[in-house]
Amino acid sequence: MEVKVLSSKLVKPAYNGGVAAAPDVEYIPLSIFDKVTYKMQMAIIYAFPPPAPSTAAIEKGLAAVLAQYRAFAGQLGESPDGEAAVVLNDRGARLVEAAVDADLVDMAPAKPTPELLRLHPDLEGELQEVVLLQLTRFRCGSLAVGFTSNHVVADGHATSNFLVAWGRATRGLPMGAPPVHHHAALFKPRPSPHVEHDHRNREYYLPAAGDDSHGHGDGGAADNIVIHKAHFTKDFIAGLRAAASEGRGRPFSRFETILAHLWRTMTRARGLSPDEASTIRLSVDGRHRLGAPAEYFGNLVLWAFPRATVGDLLTRPLKHAAQVIHDEVARVDGAYFRSFLDFALSGAGGDKEGLAPSAVLKDVLCPNAEVDSWLTFPFYELDFGTGSPTYFMPSYFPTEGMLFLVPSYLGDGSVDAFVPVFNHNLEAFKECCYSME
């Protein structure tokens, strides 16, 4: 796919339609949740059918929404007191215009491949912007929107709120409630800190001397990884849930059931020893658990770590894997989040012990896995005035074992799972992916 870049510019916030002066520079201190999350760029791809909205309309909407979401027009830096912060300096978001002399249906892959990276701005070198966008127009009139944002500034929940507001601003509609930012008094340890969980070995780890095993993208593993798209129909999911929940008063959730099935499927395809242990890392949103508003803009996520032996996963029924996931997620409740705050902010651990965040990127997760579930995020509500996107998916991210769960664009309750696997495990994965056994 040959992509021709036409222009690149910074889009700055437009206050009150561009007639009001910009406010003074402000600083949003990074919260402890921002500091322990992944230091990575989160990249997603949208596709809109013709007639696609004009670039001028999209840019105008972007300038308007950045006035409300200033963090996405700022930069990562330091506050005057030397603390890590998002600097609200209105530098702007990078907007790239590009074109492809071909029809989208002939060029766009149905699953993430290296070619998808051409639908994003170049991410090489030191990035100055928090948000980078590329609008790529195809010969047929379709539009691809490549969106990239710094994960340290906002998690998936916050980013999806921004995207919906961007669409509304482009259509001239109210953007909704403004974002609520972190401040020094928002997350604090309790007067009498009470650490109830082993945060040293969950959110943190103690690096060994000279430990460089937590790198990403420098080991050549990506050449042997393919991202497989598994489509689970509503009927298939219903069958899985019925099988997993048999004899249980309250059925397992759609997420618990699909993840349990994929955990077992990946484990079987990998051909692991029965005595080997497998752990899943999955995000748990803390907004409700800590009583934070839904509009909180930043990171407010910790992780659950379901763990089981390969033998148990493969010889015991689906119900077992679903129960392990359910119990571990339930454990990460409000008390768990408060225990983490006490540990991380009271001086009980963290930097003083030489600990580092365990949320680090790897090329290969085997025998473990990680899941990003976007099943409840309103990504499909991004509408620039010509309707919802025809599809939405994560961009190319070749980390073996990193799963993404996304609602299908069909809108019928089906789910798409994007599963990076080794080439030599792909056929084994396909063989058991749609089996109820």
From Swiss-Prot:
Expressing tissues: Highly expressed in roots. Expressed at low levels in shoots and flowers.
Cross-referenced Gene3D superfamilies: Chloramphenicol acetyltransferase-like domain
Keyword Transferase applies: yes
EC class of the enzyme, as a word: transferase
Enzyme Commission designation: 2.3.1.-
Keywords of the record: Acyltransferase, Transferase
Domain of life: Eukaryota
GO terms for MF: acyltransferase activity, transferring groups other than amino-acyl groups; hydroxycinnamoyltransferase activity
Active site: 151, 383
Family in the record: Belongs to the plant acyltransferase family.
Task performed by this protein: Hydroxycinnamoyl transferase that catalyzes the transfer of an acyl from p-coumaryol-CoA to putrescine, to produce coumaroyl putrescine. Can use feruloyl-CoA and caffeoyl-CoA as acyl donors.
UniProt name for this protein: Putrescine hydroxycinnamoyltransferase 3
